[in-house]
Amino acid sequence: MSNTGSLRRTERAPLSAAFTRDGVATAIAALLFTVILVSFRPFQPAGAEMTGDGGDIVNQLGFGSLGAISIFSLMAFADPRVVRSLLSPSWLLMLAFLVLSVVMATDPPSAMRAASFTLIGILTMATILALPRDAEAFSKVIIFTSVVVMGLSYVGLIVFPHEALHTTASLEPEHAGLWRGVFTHKNIAGPVMACFSFAGLYLYRRGQRLWGASIFCAAMIFMLHTGSKTTAGLVPFSILIVVLPGLIGMRLGTPILFALAIIATAIATLGIVFLPPVKHLAALYFPDLTYTGRTTLWEFAGEMLAKRPWTGYGYESFWGTPLLLNQDQPFDRAWDIRTIVHGHNGYLDIAVLMGIPALCVAVYTFLIAPLRDYMRIPLRKENIYLGDFFMMVALFAALNAFLESFFFHRADPVWLFFVFGMFGLRQVSLRPMAVRGLS
Protein backbone atom coordinates (compact mmCIF):
# COMPACT_ATOMS: atom_id res chain seq x y z
CA MET A 1 0.00 0.00 0.00
CA SER A 2 1.54 3.25 -1.05
CA ASN A 3 0.31 6.75 -0.47
CA THR A 4 -1.27 8.01 -3.70
CA GLY A 5 -4.91 8.81 -4.31
CA SER A 6 -7.29 11.64 -5.14
CA LEU A 7 -10.56 12.23 -3.35
CA ARG A 8 -12.12 14.31 -6.15
CA ARG A 9 -11.16 11.90 -8.90
CA THR A 10 -12.65 8.99 -6.94
CA GLU A 11 -15.93 10.80 -6.26
CA ARG A 12 -16.29 12.06 -9.82
CA ALA A 13 -15.70 8.82 -11.68
CA PRO A 14 -16.08 5.79 -9.40
CA LEU A 15 -16.81 3.41 -12.30
CA SER A 16 -13.96 4.49 -14.53
CA ALA A 17 -11.63 4.36 -11.53
CA ALA A 18 -12.01 0.59 -11.52
CA PHE A 19 -10.22 0.43 -14.88
CA THR A 20 -7.32 2.64 -13.94
CA ARG A 21 -3.92 1.26 -13.02
CA ASP A 22 -4.75 1.53 -9.32
CA GLY A 23 -8.20 0.01 -9.84
CA VAL A 24 -6.78 -3.00 -11.65
CA ALA A 25 -4.14 -3.48 -8.94
CA THR A 26 -6.83 -3.42 -6.25
CA ALA A 27 -8.96 -5.92 -8.17
CA ILE A 28 -6.00 -8.28 -8.59
CA ALA A 29 -5.24 -8.10 -4.86
CA ALA A 30 -8.87 -8.87 -4.00
CA LEU A 31 -8.99 -11.84 -6.37
CA LEU A 32 -5.67 -13.23 -5.14
CA PHE A 33 -6.78 -12.97 -1.51
CA THR A 34 -10.10 -14.64 -2.21
CA VAL A 35 -8.74 -17.46 -4.34
CA ILE A 36 -5.91 -18.42 -2.00
CA LEU A 37 -8.27 -18.55 1.00
CA VAL A 38 -11.01 -20.49 -0.79
CA SER A 39 -8.37 -22.73 -2.41
CA PHE A 40 -8.76 -24.69 -5.63
CA ARG A 41 -10.62 -27.47 -3.86
CA PRO A 42 -13.29 -25.87 -1.65
CA PHE A 43 -15.82 -28.01 0.21
CA GLN A 44 -13.45 -30.99 0.17
CA PRO A 45 -12.36 -32.33 3.57
CA ALA A 46 -9.33 -34.00 1.97
CA GLY A 47 -8.18 -30.78 0.32
CA ALA A 48 -5.61 -29.95 2.96
CA GLU A 49 -3.69 -33.10 2.25
CA MET A 50 -3.97 -32.73 -1.51
CA THR A 51 -2.51 -29.22 -1.41
CA GLY A 52 0.97 -30.62 -1.17
CA ASP A 53 0.44 -33.59 -3.43
CA GLY A 54 2.78 -33.28 -6.37
CA GLY A 55 0.45 -35.39 -8.51
CA ASP A 56 -2.56 -33.10 -8.06
CA ILE A 57 -2.69 -31.24 -11.37
CA VAL A 58 -5.41 -28.85 -10.16
CA ASN A 59 -3.25 -27.55 -7.34
CA GLN A 60 -0.12 -27.56 -9.46
CA LEU A 61 -1.71 -25.38 -12.13
CA GLY A 62 -3.67 -23.28 -9.66
CA PHE A 63 -0.84 -22.38 -7.32
CA GLY A 64 1.60 -22.06 -10.19
CA SER A 65 -0.76 -19.50 -11.72
CA LEU A 66 -1.07 -17.65 -8.41
CA GLY A 67 2.70 -17.41 -8.20
CA ALA A 68 3.02 -16.18 -11.78
CA ILE A 69 0.26 -13.59 -11.36
CA SER A 70 1.81 -12.40 -8.12
CA ILE A 71 5.24 -11.90 -9.68
CA PHE A 72 3.75 -10.11 -12.70
CA SER A 73 1.60 -7.88 -10.50
CA LEU A 74 4.52 -6.91 -8.28
CA MET A 75 6.56 -5.95 -11.33
CA ALA A 76 3.74 -4.13 -13.12
CA PHE A 77 1.74 -2.41 -10.37
CA ALA A 78 3.59 -2.33 -7.04
CA ASP A 79 5.90 0.37 -5.75
CA PRO A 80 9.40 -1.19 -5.81
CA ARG A 81 10.19 0.42 -2.45
CA VAL A 82 7.20 -1.31 -0.88
CA VAL A 83 8.22 -4.66 -2.33
CA ARG A 84 11.80 -4.32 -1.10
CA SER A 85 10.65 -3.39 2.39
CA LEU A 86 8.48 -6.45 2.94
CA LEU A 87 11.22 -9.04 3.38
CA SER A 88 13.38 -8.20 6.37
CA PRO A 89 16.74 -9.87 7.10
CA SER A 90 15.10 -12.04 9.75
CA TRP A 91 12.54 -13.28 7.23
CA LEU A 92 15.28 -14.06 4.71
CA LEU A 93 17.11 -16.05 7.40
CA MET A 94 13.88 -17.85 8.31
CA LEU A 95 13.36 -18.81 4.67
CA ALA A 96 16.98 -19.99 4.50
CA PHE A 97 16.23 -22.40 7.35
CA LEU A 98 13.18 -23.59 5.42
CA VAL A 99 15.34 -24.34 2.38
CA LEU A 100 17.90 -26.10 4.58
CA SER A 101 15.17 -28.25 6.12
CA VAL A 102 14.07 -29.24 2.62
CA VAL A 103 17.62 -30.34 1.84
CA MET A 104 17.70 -32.31 5.11
CA ALA A 105 14.34 -33.99 4.41
CA THR A 106 14.10 -37.74 3.96
CA ASP A 107 12.52 -37.14 0.54
CA PRO A 108 13.86 -33.78 -0.74
CA PRO A 109 11.85 -33.75 -4.03
CA SER A 110 8.56 -34.26 -2.19
CA ALA A 111 9.56 -31.75 0.48
CA MET A 112 10.46 -29.24 -2.22
CA ARG A 113 7.04 -29.63 -3.83
CA ALA A 114 5.37 -29.01 -0.47
CA ALA A 115 7.66 -26.07 0.30
CA SER A 116 6.85 -24.52 -3.08
CA PHE A 117 3.22 -24.18 -2.00
CA THR A 118 4.41 -22.47 1.19
CA LEU A 119 6.62 -20.05 -0.75
CA ILE A 120 3.85 -19.25 -3.24
CA GLY A 121 1.51 -18.57 -0.32
CA ILE A 122 4.01 -16.14 1.24
CA LEU A 123 4.58 -14.46 -2.14
CA THR A 124 0.85 -14.09 -2.70
CA MET A 125 0.24 -12.50 0.70
CA ALA A 126 3.09 -10.06 0.09
CA THR A 127 1.53 -9.16 -3.26
CA ILE A 128 -1.90 -8.60 -1.70
CA LEU A 129 -0.35 -6.07 0.68
CA ALA A 130 1.83 -4.35 -1.91
CA LEU A 131 -0.81 -3.70 -4.59
CA PRO A 132 -3.48 -1.51 -2.88
CA ARG A 133 -2.44 2.15 -3.13
CA ASP A 134 -4.07 3.45 0.04
CA ALA A 135 -6.33 2.54 2.95
CA GLU A 136 -9.49 2.88 0.88
CA ALA A 137 -8.21 0.43 -1.74
CA PHE A 138 -7.14 -1.96 0.99
CA SER A 139 -10.62 -1.75 2.53
CA LYS A 140 -12.14 -2.75 -0.80
CA VAL A 141 -9.88 -5.80 -0.89
CA ILE A 142 -10.95 -6.76 2.63
CA ILE A 143 -14.65 -6.26 1.90
CA PHE A 144 -14.59 -8.28 -1.33
CA THR A 145 -12.64 -11.17 0.19
CA SER A 146 -14.72 -11.30 3.37
CA VAL A 147 -18.04 -11.22 1.52
CA VAL A 148 -17.06 -13.90 -1.00
CA VAL A 149 -15.39 -16.31 1.45
CA MET A 150 -18.08 -15.98 4.12
CA GLY A 151 -20.83 -15.95 1.51
CA LEU A 152 -19.61 -19.22 0.00
CA SER A 153 -19.27 -20.73 3.47
CA TYR A 154 -22.82 -19.80 4.46
CA VAL A 155 -24.28 -20.90 1.12
CA GLY A 156 -22.39 -24.18 1.46
CA LEU A 157 -24.27 -24.95 4.67
CA ILE A 158 -27.44 -25.17 2.56
CA VAL A 159 -26.19 -26.35 -0.82
CA PHE A 160 -23.37 -28.68 0.31
CA PRO A 161 -24.28 -29.59 3.91
CA HIS A 162 -22.22 -32.80 3.95
CA GLU A 163 -19.12 -30.86 2.88
CA ALA A 164 -19.66 -27.56 4.73
CA LEU A 165 -20.55 -29.33 7.99
CA HIS A 166 -18.77 -31.99 9.98
CA THR A 167 -20.98 -35.09 9.92
CA THR A 168 -21.09 -38.46 11.61
CA ALA A 169 -19.60 -39.88 8.41
CA SER A 170 -16.54 -37.62 8.74
CA LEU A 171 -13.16 -38.84 9.96
CA GLU A 172 -13.99 -37.20 13.31
CA PRO A 173 -17.65 -38.03 13.99
CA GLU A 174 -17.44 -36.35 17.40
CA HIS A 175 -17.46 -33.01 15.54
CA ALA A 176 -20.77 -33.74 13.80
CA GLY A 177 -22.87 -30.62 13.31
CA LEU A 178 -19.99 -28.15 13.59
CA TRP A 179 -19.48 -25.71 10.73
CA ARG A 180 -16.41 -25.62 8.48
CA GLY A 181 -17.71 -23.84 5.34
CA VAL A 182 -15.38 -23.94 2.34
CA PHE A 183 -12.52 -25.08 4.57
CA THR A 184 -11.30 -28.57 5.34
CA HIS A 185 -11.79 -28.48 9.11
CA LYS A 186 -13.46 -26.47 11.84
CA ASN A 187 -10.02 -25.69 13.28
CA ILE A 188 -9.25 -23.77 10.09
CA ALA A 189 -12.69 -22.21 9.62
CA GLY A 190 -12.79 -20.86 13.19
CA PRO A 191 -9.49 -18.91 13.08
CA VAL A 192 -10.21 -17.58 9.58
CA MET A 193 -13.57 -16.24 10.73
CA ALA A 194 -11.83 -14.75 13.75
CA CYS A 195 -9.52 -12.83 11.43
CA PHE A 196 -12.51 -11.66 9.39
CA SER A 197 -14.07 -10.36 12.61
CA PHE A 198 -10.93 -8.27 13.16
CA ALA A 199 -11.29 -7.00 9.59
CA GLY A 200 -14.89 -6.00 10.30
CA LEU A 201 -13.79 -4.10 13.39
CA TYR A 202 -11.11 -2.32 11.35
CA LEU A 203 -13.66 -1.25 8.74
CA TYR A 204 -16.05 -0.04 11.44
CA ARG A 205 -13.35 2.02 13.16
CA ARG A 206 -12.34 3.78 9.95
CA GLY A 207 -15.92 4.84 9.23
CA GLN A 208 -17.36 2.05 7.08
CA ARG A 209 -19.95 1.23 9.72
CA LEU A 210 -22.36 -0.92 7.73
CA TRP A 211 -19.72 -3.09 6.08
CA GLY A 212 -17.74 -3.35 9.30
CA ALA A 213 -20.65 -4.33 11.52
CA SER A 214 -22.04 -6.80 8.97
CA ILE A 215 -18.71 -8.56 8.44
CA PHE A 216 -17.97 -8.63 12.17
CA CYS A 217 -21.34 -10.14 13.08
CA ALA A 218 -21.36 -12.68 10.22
CA ALA A 219 -17.83 -13.80 11.07
CA MET A 220 -18.57 -14.12 14.79
CA ILE A 221 -21.74 -16.14 14.19
CA PHE A 222 -19.91 -18.57 11.91
CA MET A 223 -16.93 -18.77 14.25
CA LEU A 224 -19.13 -19.65 17.23
CA HIS A 225 -20.72 -22.49 15.23
CA THR A 226 -17.31 -24.06 14.55
CA GLY A 227 -17.28 -25.11 18.19
CA SER A 228 -13.76 -23.85 18.82
CA LYS A 229 -13.63 -22.71 22.44
CA THR A 230 -10.02 -21.59 22.09
CA THR A 231 -10.85 -19.34 19.15
CA ALA A 232 -13.95 -17.97 20.86
CA GLY A 233 -11.84 -16.99 23.86
CA LEU A 234 -8.92 -15.56 21.91
CA VAL A 235 -10.99 -13.19 19.75
CA PRO A 236 -12.19 -10.83 22.51
CA PHE A 237 -8.85 -11.24 24.29
CA SER A 238 -6.92 -10.12 21.19
CA ILE A 239 -9.27 -7.18 20.59
CA LEU A 240 -8.96 -5.94 24.17
CA ILE A 241 -5.17 -6.26 24.29
CA VAL A 242 -4.78 -4.25 21.08
CA VAL A 243 -7.56 -1.65 21.31
CA LEU A 244 -7.90 -0.92 25.02
CA PRO A 245 -4.38 0.49 25.69
CA GLY A 246 -4.79 2.95 22.82
CA LEU A 247 -8.17 4.11 24.08
CA ILE A 248 -6.72 5.03 27.47
CA GLY A 249 -3.62 6.69 26.01
CA MET A 250 -1.18 3.87 26.76
CA ARG A 251 -0.31 2.51 23.33
CA LEU A 252 2.91 1.03 24.74
CA GLY A 253 0.69 -1.30 26.75
CA THR A 254 -0.18 -3.36 23.68
CA PRO A 255 3.31 -4.80 23.00
CA ILE A 256 3.85 -5.29 26.73
CA LEU A 257 0.60 -7.22 27.08
CA PHE A 258 1.41 -9.12 23.86
CA ALA A 259 4.73 -10.27 25.30
CA LEU A 260 3.19 -11.19 28.65
CA ALA A 261 0.41 -13.16 26.93
CA ILE A 262 2.92 -15.11 24.83
CA ILE A 263 5.14 -15.89 27.84
CA ALA A 264 2.19 -16.93 30.00
CA THR A 265 0.76 -19.14 27.26
CA ALA A 266 4.13 -20.76 26.61
CA ILE A 267 4.50 -21.59 30.30
CA ALA A 268 0.92 -22.86 30.55
CA THR A 269 1.33 -25.17 27.54
CA LEU A 270 4.90 -26.28 26.83
CA GLY A 271 5.96 -25.33 30.35
CA ILE A 272 3.92 -28.11 31.98
CA VAL A 273 5.88 -30.59 29.86
CA PHE A 274 9.42 -29.21 29.75
CA LEU A 275 9.82 -27.04 32.87
CA PRO A 276 10.09 -29.27 35.99
CA PRO A 277 8.76 -26.69 38.50
CA VAL A 278 5.77 -25.90 36.29
CA LYS A 279 5.24 -29.59 35.57
CA HIS A 280 5.21 -30.30 39.31
CA LEU A 281 2.69 -27.53 40.02
CA ALA A 282 0.46 -28.69 37.17
CA ALA A 283 0.53 -32.28 38.43
CA LEU A 284 -0.30 -31.05 41.92
CA TYR A 285 -3.14 -28.64 41.17
CA PHE A 286 -4.29 -29.59 37.66
CA PRO A 287 -3.60 -33.33 37.30
CA ASP A 288 -6.02 -33.72 34.38
CA LEU A 289 -4.61 -30.81 32.35
CA THR A 290 -3.49 -32.41 29.07
CA TYR A 291 -5.06 -30.10 26.45
CA THR A 292 -7.04 -33.07 25.08
CA GLY A 293 -3.96 -35.27 24.96
CA ARG A 294 -1.62 -32.73 23.39
CA THR A 295 0.89 -33.01 26.23
CA THR A 296 1.53 -36.59 25.13
CA LEU A 297 2.51 -35.36 21.67
CA TRP A 298 4.73 -32.64 23.10
CA GLU A 299 6.55 -35.06 25.39
CA PHE A 300 7.22 -37.40 22.48
CA ALA A 301 8.30 -34.54 20.20
CA GLY A 302 10.66 -33.28 22.90
CA GLU A 303 12.24 -36.70 23.28
CA MET A 304 12.77 -36.97 19.52
CA LEU A 305 14.07 -33.40 19.27
CA ALA A 306 16.75 -34.20 21.85
CA LYS A 307 18.21 -36.67 19.35
CA ARG A 308 18.57 -34.05 16.57
CA PRO A 309 18.45 -30.61 18.21
CA TRP A 310 20.50 -28.65 15.69
CA THR A 311 18.98 -29.63 12.36
CA GLY A 312 15.70 -31.31 13.23
CA TYR A 313 14.33 -34.05 11.01
CA GLY A 314 13.69 -32.02 7.87
CA TYR A 315 10.65 -30.42 6.29
CA GLU A 316 7.67 -32.79 6.01
CA SER A 317 9.88 -35.55 7.46
CA PHE A 318 8.51 -36.25 10.91
CA TRP A 319 4.76 -36.45 11.57
CA GLY A 320 2.97 -39.00 9.42
CA THR A 321 6.19 -40.48 8.03
CA PRO A 322 7.61 -44.04 8.23
CA LEU A 323 9.82 -42.80 11.08
CA LEU A 324 6.72 -42.69 13.29
CA LEU A 325 4.59 -45.29 11.54
CA ASN A 326 7.11 -47.92 12.62
CA GLN A 327 7.05 -46.79 16.26
CA ASP A 328 5.43 -48.90 18.95
CA GLN A 329 2.29 -47.47 20.55
CA PRO A 330 2.28 -47.80 24.37
CA PHE A 331 -1.12 -48.79 25.71
CA ASP A 332 -1.26 -45.79 28.09
CA ARG A 333 -0.45 -43.10 25.50
CA ALA A 334 -3.42 -40.73 25.04
CA TRP A 335 -2.94 -40.32 21.27
CA ASP A 336 -1.50 -42.70 18.72
CA ILE A 337 1.43 -40.69 17.37
CA ARG A 338 1.51 -42.89 14.26
CA THR A 339 -1.68 -41.27 12.93
CA ILE A 340 -0.93 -37.65 13.89
CA VAL A 341 -0.23 -35.20 11.05
CA HIS A 342 1.31 -32.45 13.22
CA GLY A 343 2.33 -31.80 16.81
CA HIS A 344 -0.45 -29.36 17.75
CA ASN A 345 2.15 -26.75 18.64
CA GLY A 346 3.65 -24.68 15.86
CA TYR A 347 6.73 -23.59 17.77
CA LEU A 348 7.67 -27.11 18.80
CA ASP A 349 7.08 -28.32 15.26
CA ILE A 350 9.51 -25.73 13.89
CA ALA A 351 12.17 -27.09 16.26
CA VAL A 352 11.40 -30.70 15.35
CA LEU A 353 11.48 -30.05 11.59
CA MET A 354 14.18 -27.35 11.34
CA GLY A 355 16.13 -27.45 14.59
CA ILE A 356 16.42 -25.26 17.67
CA PRO A 357 18.42 -22.51 15.86
CA ALA A 358 15.51 -22.12 13.44
CA LEU A 359 13.13 -21.87 16.39
CA CYS A 360 15.20 -19.02 17.82
CA VAL A 361 14.99 -17.15 14.52
CA ALA A 362 11.26 -17.86 14.37
CA VAL A 363 10.72 -16.43 17.86
CA TYR A 364 12.35 -13.19 16.77
CA THR A 365 10.66 -13.06 13.36
CA PHE A 366 7.18 -14.08 14.50
CA LEU A 367 7.01 -12.56 17.99
CA ILE A 368 9.60 -9.85 18.59
CA ALA A 369 9.84 -8.11 15.19
CA PRO A 370 6.06 -7.49 15.00
CA LEU A 371 6.20 -5.70 18.37
CA ARG A 372 9.03 -3.50 17.12
CA ASP A 373 7.07 -2.72 13.95
CA TYR A 374 3.94 -1.93 15.95
CA MET A 375 5.78 0.64 18.06
CA ARG A 376 7.14 2.29 14.89
CA ILE A 377 3.71 2.87 13.35
CA PRO A 378 3.20 6.59 12.56
CA LEU A 379 0.62 8.16 14.85
CA ARG A 380 -1.86 8.84 12.06
CA LYS A 381 -5.43 7.61 12.22
CA GLU A 382 -5.28 5.30 9.19
CA ASN A 383 -1.94 3.83 10.24
CA ILE A 384 -3.17 3.21 13.78
CA TYR A 385 -6.40 1.51 12.67
CA LEU A 386 -4.64 -0.66 10.12
CA GLY A 387 -1.77 -1.44 12.48
CA ASP A 388 -4.24 -2.49 15.17
CA PHE A 389 -5.94 -4.83 12.68
CA PHE A 390 -2.67 -6.48 11.74
CA MET A 391 -1.66 -6.74 15.40
CA MET A 392 -4.94 -8.48 16.30
CA VAL A 393 -4.34 -11.02 13.54
CA ALA A 394 -0.71 -11.58 14.56
CA LEU A 395 -1.51 -11.89 18.28
CA PHE A 396 -4.43 -14.23 17.73
CA ALA A 397 -2.46 -16.53 15.41
CA ALA A 398 0.65 -16.47 17.61
CA LEU A 399 -1.38 -17.60 20.63
CA ASN A 400 -3.36 -20.13 18.61
CA ALA A 401 -0.07 -21.68 17.46
CA PHE A 402 0.53 -22.99 20.98
CA LEU A 403 -2.32 -25.47 20.45
CA GLU A 404 -2.30 -25.89 16.67
CA SER A 405 0.46 -26.23 14.10
CA PHE A 406 0.31 -24.21 10.89
CA PHE A 407 3.70 -22.50 10.50
CA PHE A 408 5.05 -23.07 6.97
CA HIS A 409 2.17 -25.47 6.35
CA ARG A 410 1.80 -24.93 2.62
CA ALA A 411 -1.24 -22.72 1.89
CA ASP A 412 -2.99 -23.22 5.23
CA PRO A 413 -5.35 -20.20 5.54
CA VAL A 414 -4.41 -19.63 9.19
CA TRP A 415 -0.72 -19.53 8.26
CA LEU A 416 -1.52 -17.16 5.39
CA PHE A 417 -3.35 -14.78 7.72
CA PHE A 418 -0.40 -14.88 10.13
CA VAL A 419 1.97 -13.94 7.30
CA PHE A 420 -0.53 -11.26 6.30
CA GLY A 421 -0.45 -9.78 9.80
CA MET A 422 3.35 -9.80 10.12
CA PHE A 423 4.02 -8.34 6.66
CA GLY A 424 1.22 -5.84 7.19
CA LEU A 425 2.71 -4.58 10.45
CA ARG A 426 6.07 -4.10 8.80
CA GLN A 427 4.57 -2.22 5.88
CA VAL A 428 2.27 0.08 7.86
CA SER A 429 5.17 0.99 10.16
CA LEU A 430 7.32 2.28 7.31
CA ARG A 431 5.07 4.88 5.64
CA PRO A 432 2.01 7.03 6.36
CA MET A 433 -1.25 5.87 4.82
CA ALA A 434 -3.13 8.16 2.47
CA VAL A 435 -6.82 8.88 3.06
CA ARG A 436 -9.59 9.06 0.48
CA GLY A 437 -13.31 9.43 0.79
CA LEU A 438 -15.11 6.50 2.40
CA SER A 439 -17.51 4.51 0.28
What do the predicted segments below correspond to?
Residues 54-74, 115-124, 188-197, 233-240, ...:
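Membrane-embedded alpha-helical segments of multi-pass membrane proteins
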Residues 1-100, 130-140, 207, 427-439:
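Transmembrane signal-anchor hairpin modules in multi-pass inner-membrane enzymes, especially those
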Residues 130, 208-210, 244-247, 256, ...:
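Hydrophobic transmembrane alpha-helices and their immediate junctions
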Residues 387-439:
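Transmembrane alpha-helices of multi-pass inner-membrane enzymes
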Residues 66-70, 98-99, 139-174, 181-247, ...:
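Alpha-helical transmembrane segments of multi-pass inner-membrane proteins
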Residues 283-299, 307, 311-354, 373, ...:
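Long extracytoplasmic/lumenal interhelical loops at the membrane interface
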Residues 154-161, 225-226, 243-289, 302-307, ...:
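A membrane-periplasm/extracellular boundary helix in multi-pass inner-membrane enzymes
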Residues 87-96, 108-130, 141-146, 192:
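Aromatic-anchored transmembrane helix interface
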